[in-house]
């Protein structure tokens, strides 16, 4: 018996990133359901609402929107009311609470979070930095980093640094290679936060085997052999302990969770701020 499809319409006056992320987080809590998402972005005039409503009528389902323009909102909500479709204003509870506390109304301007402000250019600079100092490159610039991520192969060093860079944090990463001493630039480093990533040896071995298969190489090489991997992990952890570096086990953590932990250590994302 085939699973019934449920339709959800995501409507935004900007890129749709906010409503997409929130709905994705909510849907993750529901198992064994099939949801078809319909995306309607850059809704900037009441005349565009008709096209959206036509799509909703074709595939009826809950509407979740982030639209700030009052006229467009009214047109969308009224159209949904007439066809008896639930219509959820995603940001209203937060905006109302903030307006009450701040004793002022927010600017009703779509996409304000995407303006080319200082934060935007800081993120671009951080992305260039992370790319330039990826995988042990440009070690002479290591002291310019805010955080240096260290780990054996396949411990998510690069994606973690790229995620941090997207938050405007200058992040570099240095690989630990069996049989090769860590670079002096890393060992003599003073100033930046150094974070050592580790992973369960069995999980790490499985990941490396998968990588080798994708590359059509021998999956039984020492690179992926579990005992060899376990030795690598032990040696890395000994190094972390000797150097007093922060250690994060990434075995059951997403990239976002690892980055959030690092940001907490940096002090750039205390409780009440964040990703």
From Swiss-Prot:
Keyword vocabulary terms for this entry: Kinase, Nucleotide-binding, Serine/threonine-protein kinase, Transferase
EC number: 2.7.11.32, 2.7.4.27
Record field: catalytic activity: N(tele)-phospho-L-histidyl/L-threonyl-[pyruvate, phosphate dikinase] + ADP = N(tele)-phospho-L-histidyl/O-phospho-L-threonyl-[pyruvate, phosphate dikinase] + AMP + H(+); N(tele)-phospho-L-histidyl/O-phospho-L-threonyl-[pyruvate, phosphate dikinase] + phosphate + H(+) = N(tele)-phospho-L-histidyl/L-threonyl-[pyruvate, phosphate dikinase] + diphosphate
UniProt keyword Nucleotide-binding, yes or no: yes
InterPro entries found in the cross-reference section: Kinase-pyrophosphorylase, PPDK_reg
Source taxon at top rank: Bacteria
Physiological role: Bifunctional serine/threonine kinase and phosphorylase involved in the regulation of the pyruvate, phosphate dikinase (PPDK) by catalyzing its phosphorylation/dephosphorylation.
Record-stated family: Belongs to the pyruvate, phosphate/water dikinase regulatory protein family. PDRP subfamily.
Protein name according to UniProt: Putative pyruvate, phosphate dikinase regulatory protein
